[in-house]
């Protein structure tokens, strides 16, 4: 089984991060930060699309997802990933513009790797990726 550090990394390539956010602006920001740090990025606009992509391409190094999204929240996406024997090793990071300790704790208890507050800063992503993926 691939580890979180090797999962989604092609030989000699960069880690593959799945960015999930219903806001096109936030999706572009997080994708830009990740790409500037030399990560391969696939960006989708919903938890449902993330699960569809993971069904056809499970080789993702990490998932960074917004908490509040229509159809499926980031928390619901986290639960589905962690319940899947095929996907549960993928680190999931939740992002939110709301600093609500009960929500943060619930996500961490459910298996989230970390919780980032928006607006996400390049230093936050750099710290996170170096800890989780390198």
UniProtKB/Swiss-Prot annotation:
Two-component system major event consists of a His-to-Asp phosphorelay between a sensor histidine kinase (HK) and a response regulator (RR). In plants, the His-to-Asp phosphorelay involves an additional intermediate named Histidine-containing phosphotransfer protein (HPt). This multistep phosphorelay consists of a His-Asp-His-Asp sequential transfer of a phosphate group between first a His and an Asp of the HK protein, followed by the transfer to a conserved His of the HPt protein and finally the transfer to an Asp in the receiver domain of the RR protein. GO terms for biological process: cytokinin-activated signaling pathway; phosphorelay signal transduction system. One of its GO terms (cellular component) is nucleus. It is found in: Cytoplasm, Cytosol; Nucleus. Disruption phenotype: Dwarf, narrow leaf, low tillering and altered kernal color phenotypes. Weakly expressed in flowers and panicles. Induction: By cytokinin in roots and leaves. The keyword Cell wall biogenesis/degradation does not apply. Its main location: cytoplasm. The keyword Amino-acid biosynthesis does not apply. The modification 4-aspartylphosphate is found at residue 66. Pfam families: Response_reg. Functions as a response regulator involved in His-to-Asp phosphorelay signal transduction system. Phosphorylation of the Asp residue in the receiver domain activates the ability of the protein to promote the transcription of target genes. Type-A response regulators seem to act as negative regulators of the cytokinin signaling. This is Two-component response regulator ORR5.
């Amino acid at each position: 089984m691939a580890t979180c550090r090797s999962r989604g990394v092609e030989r000699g390539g960069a880690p593959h991060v799945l960015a999930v956010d219903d806001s096109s602006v936030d999706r572009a920001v997080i994708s830009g930060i990740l790409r500037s740090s030399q990560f391969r990025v696939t960006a989708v606009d919903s938890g449902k699309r993330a699960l569809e992509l993971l069904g056809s391409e499970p080789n993702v190094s990490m998932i960074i997802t917004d908490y509040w999204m229509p159809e499926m929240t980031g928390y619901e996406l986290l639960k589905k990933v962690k319940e899947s024997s095929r996907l549960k090793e993928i680190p999931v990071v939740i992002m939110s513009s709301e600093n609500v300790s009960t929500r943060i704790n619930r996500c961490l208890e459910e298996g989230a790797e970390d919780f980032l507050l928006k607006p996400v800063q390049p230093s936050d992503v750099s710290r996170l990726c170096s800890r989780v993926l390198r």
